[in-house]
Each structure stands twice: as structure tokens, then as C-alpha cells.
């Protein structure tokens, strides 16, 4: 977003610009003006401190096995009798009933009635087994094209394209957000004034079924359009050079039948953190799959209540939520999730990398968290413990919300008293702390506190004040002042989150939109400073 003007690898000659550019945006993940775009950010990073050892609920763990943002799901139920699909990614079987396959392999779908895992037969090996349905697409369809990412937002397209690893001309095609039935071509570019940026070109559809960006050059198919602009810029900011890299998506669950799993199917390998209620480990399931495992101390919560809540939690599926994979439901309870490589946002902010983060990256992280919480809001769910310690950071500054809903189940007296030593009073809305009224609006209050954690690089809220004092002062109308170097417009947003009447606080949908458009609609003149 604002600070860096690192020059990317050249992908070919530059050409004149089309007039029908849908828009462009500044980079998200550039951290330092001295960095070169061919060099991974990880070369500047010390080993992550995955989790702290404070006496709070520590988050789940998680990984994306690739160094890029998780790609969207592009497939759904079979339509029109199509039974031959093509693999979008490699997949190694995790159980005896799974089917391994390679990217590009053709598969015949035998049974797709079980939702997330389909029974398929490989047309090359003849073997049959279950496959993750979001790893395949109908053969010869637009969904099978590597450059087609379907229904992703403009903002997510920019996050993917603005990696320093990508050369000019890196591209993807997605559905248009503004015009039904139309598509958008998003292309990475570079210029000396604006640095790395993305141009968006609307692809319109002809009544006869063809496609065009400019009416003087028309194509029978999207494939033909992409092939043409890969050879000729012809008005684009740059010819198309490289398909935008994406990571394998998370499978929905570990395998077809893995939900309540035996304890001996898990191997705990590396302890990542410890809190008052348990530990977090990196481990392996079934000898095949990297996972994070949260172990809860006996007595922390009722196994019956946990299992009931987990049935709801596993249905929450969003790219900005840590995915719950499986559980061991007998005490000690184990919670198995995706493993995310950089650990908690709190430790990330306080660590070596926090020094390199500037306001554009911090606001983008906040927008991602708001996106995940907007989904929680739509699903009529409540987090109850939203703070930086319960957000996980992956590659390319991807943020995911963890530990949603667990706080409600804790039976520890020091926690359930709501003013005990283990309760996160400084993050909790007054109506929740005093009267137990936890709603999505109390989560909005907590999000405002989380914004102070971001802008202060992990400082504890209400510095110098103890919990009892915080509760008294907030009830009297005290609100934290604007953090150093933080724009007043962002502090105003925090104040909206801290309105006394919960119904007057903004929705997460509004917060997401505000933060995603922050540097175009609210702070277009932003210039990076020494800290933010």
C-alpha cells in the first residue's frame, strides 16, 4: 500500500494504456523501500516466536503449506451430468480410502453426494478413492484454467498480485463484482511514481457469446483473450506474463470420515505455547498431515458442551477463519486445526517483524480480521474473545481469526467471574464484562481494542491501569487516546467501536469496507513515517 517502490522483475515491453481500466491499488505486503521484489520477505525475518507463554487462552495454531494466500474454492456440485473433472492441484492420500492424484490428472466422479469429499476414479491409473471436491474442476471448463479464480474480491486479487515475488504482468481472471455475468482481468504493474500496483480491466460479454476488453478486439472465449494479451499488451498496462500463484486450498476436514478421531492418530511434535487452560502443539495426523493441536487441561470445559459447540464451529468456513479439522472429545480434549506458520498476531507485532510494519500493512491486517468477523456476523455467531493473541498470521501477512466461541465454555472460576485474573477485561465491552451480555456488538468493541494493539505494535491496552480501574473508568466514559502516529480518522473508527450503546456500534461489514478503502477514501495523502 503506501510505502514501497521496489521495482519488480521485467516481464516484457510496456505499451499504451486502455481507457477502460476498472481501477488500481497500492501494494499491501511491501515492508521496506530497500527491499527488492525478487527477494522473499522471509529472508528478512528471524524465526517466528509462535506463541507467548502468558496466562491467557492461547490461540489455535495453523499452517498454509505454501508461501501464498490460500486460493478460493472454485468448484461445487456436479452440474449438467458432467462426470469428468481435472485436478487443479497435487493431492497425497491421507487415509487408505483416499485417492492420490497429480495436477492436471483427469478423474471420473463416481459419487458426489457426500459434499466435501467425492468418490472418484483416476482415468490414468484406474484406481478409485475419495478426493477433496475443492481440488478439482469440470474438464474443459473455465474453472479448470489456472488463471481463473472465480468469485474473489478485488481486494483479495490485489493481495495475491502484489507479492514482491511477482513480475510485472502477473495476472488472474475473476468474476466482476459490479456487473453480473462479466469478468475482470487483474494485472500487476509498476511505475516510478506509484510503485507496485494493480490494474483491473473489465471483460465484457457479447450477445453472441464472445468476450472483449475493448470492442475493436473481440474473442470467442476467455482462453483466446488470455492467449492474445499474453503476446500483445495492446492497450493493457503490460502484456500478460505469469499466472498469479496461489496456494492449495485447505481441504474441508482431514478426510471423509475424520471428525471425532482417536488420540493415538495424533503425534505431538513441537510445543508452540502454553496458557492457563492448556497447550498448543504442532503435530501430525495419521502420519500424513501437518496440523496444530490445542490440548485442554481436564476440567477446563465439559466434554459434552464442547462437542456440541464444536459441531457448530466446524460449519464456520471462511478463508479468514482458522479451520477446525477434528476433535478428541474425551478428556483431555484435543482440538485439531490447520497449522499457520507465523503464530499469534500479538507475538508477530512485538517481534522483529513488527518494526517493519507500517500503517498500510497494519490496516490491511485489520481489514482481513474484519472480513472474517463479518462472516461470523452473517452466521449469527459470537467470538467472545477477539484480540491479537487470538489472531494467527501466515505467509504474506495473511491473518485468520482463531478460538471463536471457546470462551463461552470455560468453567474456571477465575474466568467465569468475568473480573478474575484470567478474564481479558481490557478487551471486553462493559455490558459483557458487567452483565454477561456477549453479542456481535461486544465483539465490535473488542475489535476497536485490537486496532490499538495493531497501531501500537502489541502494547497492552490501557497502559498503567489495572483491570478494576479499567472497568470503572470505561463506565465513566473514559476511552483510550489516539496512539502515537495513528491517524485521527483511524482513532475515530475506534471510538465508533467503543460507543456505550451496543446498537450504535458499526457492523463488521462496515468495518471491513471502511478499512479496505481506507487509503483511497479516507487517507489518500498518507505518507509513511518512522513508526507508522
UniProtKB/Swiss-Prot annotation:
Residues 266-519 form the Protein kinase domain. Its EC number is 2.7.10.2. The active site is at 385 (proton acceptor). Residues 7-19 have a biased composition (Basic and acidic residues). The lineage of its organism: Eukaryota, Metazoa, Chordata, Craniata, Vertebrata. GO terms for cellular component: plasma membrane. Residues 147-244 form the SH2 domain. InterPro entries: Kinase-like_dom_sf, Non-receptor_tyrosine_kinases, Prot_kinase_dom, Protein_kinase_ATP_BS, Ser-Thr/Tyr_kinase_cat_dom, SH2, SH2_dom_sf, SH3-like_dom_sf. Keywords: ATP-binding, Cell membrane, Kinase, Lipoprotein, Membrane, Myristate, Nucleotide-binding, Phosphoprotein, SH2 domain, SH3 domain, Transferase, Tyrosine-protein kinase. The gene is src-a. One of its GO terms (molecular function) is signaling receptor binding. The keyword Lipoprotein applies. ATP binds at residues 272-280, 294. Residues 80-141 form the SH3 domain. It is found in: Cell membrane. Residues 26-40 have a biased composition (Polar residues). The modification Phosphotyrosine is found at residue 415. PROSITE patterns: PROTEIN_KINASE_ATP (PS00107), PROTEIN_KINASE_DOM (PS50011), PROTEIN_KINASE_TYR (PS00109), SH2 (PS50001), SH3 (PS50002). Residues 1-52 are annotated as: Disordered. It catalyses: L-tyrosyl-[protein] + ATP = O-phospho-L-tyrosyl-[protein] + ADP + H(+). This is Tyrosine-protein kinase Src-1. It is an enzyme of class 2 (transferase). A lipid is attached at residue 2 (N-myristoyl glycine). Belongs to the protein kinase superfamily. Tyr protein kinase family. SRC subfamily. GO terms for biological process: cell adhesion; cell differentiation; epidermal growth factor receptor signaling pathway; negative regulation of extrinsic apoptotic signaling pathway; negative regulation of intrinsic apoptotic signaling pathway; progesterone receptor signaling pathway. It comes from the Eukaryota.
Amino acid at each position: 500500500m503506501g510505502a514501497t517502490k521496489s521495482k519488480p522483475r521485467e516481464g516484457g515491453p510496456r505499451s499504451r494504456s486502455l481507457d477502460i481500466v476498472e481501477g488500481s491499488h497500492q501494494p499491501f505486503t511491501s515492508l521496506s523501500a530497500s527491499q527488492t521484489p525478487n527477494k522473499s520477505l522471509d529472508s528478512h525475518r528471524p524465526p517466528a516466536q509462535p506463541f507467548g507463554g502468558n496466562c491467557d487462552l492461547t490461540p489455535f495454531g495453523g499452517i498454509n503449506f505454501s508461501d501464498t494466500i490460500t486460493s478460493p474454492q472454485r468448484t461445487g456440485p456436479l452440474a449438467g451430468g458432467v462426470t469428468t473433472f481435472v485436478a487443479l492441484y497435487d493431492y497425497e492420500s491421507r487415509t487408505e480410502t483416499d485417492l492420490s492424484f497429480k495436477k492436471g490428472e483427469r478423474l471420473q466422479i463416481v459419487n458426489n453426494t457426500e459434499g466435501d469429499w467425492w468418490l472418484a476414479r483416476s482415468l490414468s491409473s484406474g484406481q478409485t478413492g475419495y478426493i477433496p471436491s475443492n481440488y478439482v474442476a469440470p474438464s474443459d471448463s473455465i474453472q479448470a484454467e489456472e488463471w481463473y479464480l472465480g468469485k474473489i474480491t478485488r481486494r483479495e486479487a490485489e493481495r495475491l498480485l502484489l507479492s514482491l515475488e511477482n513480475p510485472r504482468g502477473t495476472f488472474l481472471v475473476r468474476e466482476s463484482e459490479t456487473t453480473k455475468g462479466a469478468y475482470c482481468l487483474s494485472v500487476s504493474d509498476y511505475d516510478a511514481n506509484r510503485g507496485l500496483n494493480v490494474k483491473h480491466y473489465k471483460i465484457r460479454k457479447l450477445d453472441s457469446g464472445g468476450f472483449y476488453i475493448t470492442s475493436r478486439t473481440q474473442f470467442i472465449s476467455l482462453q483466446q483473450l488470455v492467449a492474445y494479451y499474453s503476446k500483445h499488451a495492446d492497450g493493457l498496462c503490460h502484456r500478460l506474463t505469469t499466472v498469479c500463484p496461489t496456494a492449495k486450498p485447505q481441504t474441508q476436514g482431514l478426510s471423509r470420515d475424520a471428525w471425532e478421531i482417536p488420540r493415538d492418530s495424533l503425534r505431538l511434535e513441537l510445543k508452540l505455547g502454553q496458557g492457563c487452560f492448556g497447550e498448543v502443539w504442532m503435530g501430525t495426523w495419521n502420519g500424513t498431515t501437518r496440523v496444530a493441536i490445542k490440548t485442554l487441561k481436564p476440567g477446563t470445559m465439559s466434554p459434552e458442551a464442547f462437542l456440541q459447540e464444536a459441531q457448530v464451529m466446524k460449519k464456520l468456513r471462511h478463508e479468514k477463519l482458522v479451520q477446525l479439522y477434528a476433535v478428541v472429545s474425551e478428556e483431555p480434549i484435543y482440538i485439531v486445526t490447520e497449522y499457520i506458520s507465523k503464530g499469534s498476531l500479538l507475538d508477530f507485532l512485538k517481534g522483529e517483524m513488527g518494526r517493519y510494519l507500517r500503517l498500510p500493512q497494519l490496516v490491511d491486517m485489520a481489514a482481513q480480521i474484519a472480513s472474517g468477523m463479518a462472516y461470523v456476523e452473517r452466521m449469527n455467531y459470537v467470538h467472545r474473545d477477539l484480540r491479537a493473541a487470538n489472531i494467527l498470521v501466515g505467509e504474506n501477512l495473511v491473518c485468520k481469526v482463531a478460538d471463536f466461541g471457546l470462551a463461552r465454555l470455560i468453567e474456571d472460576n477465575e474466568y467465569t467471574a468475568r473480573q478474575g485474573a484470567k478474564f481479558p477485561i481490557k478487551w471486553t465491552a462493559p455490558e459483557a464484562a458487567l452483565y454477561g451480555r456477549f453479542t456481535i456488538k461486544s465483539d465490535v468493541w473488542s475489535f476497536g481494542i485490537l486496532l490499538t494493539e495493531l497501531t501500537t505494535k502489541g502494547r497492552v491496552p490501557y497502559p498503567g491501569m489495572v483491570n478494576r480501574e479499567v472497568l470503572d473508568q470505561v463506565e465513566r466514559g473514559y476511552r483510550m487516546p489516539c496512539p502515537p502516529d495513528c491517524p485521527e480518522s483511524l482513532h475515530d473508527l475506534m471510538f465508533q467501536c467503543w460507543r456505550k450503546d451496543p446498537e450504535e456500534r458499526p457492523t463488521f461489514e462496515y468495518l471491513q469496507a471502511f478499512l479496505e478503502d481506507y487509503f483511497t477514501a479516507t487517507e489518500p495523502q498518507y505518507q509513511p513515517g518512522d513508526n507508522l
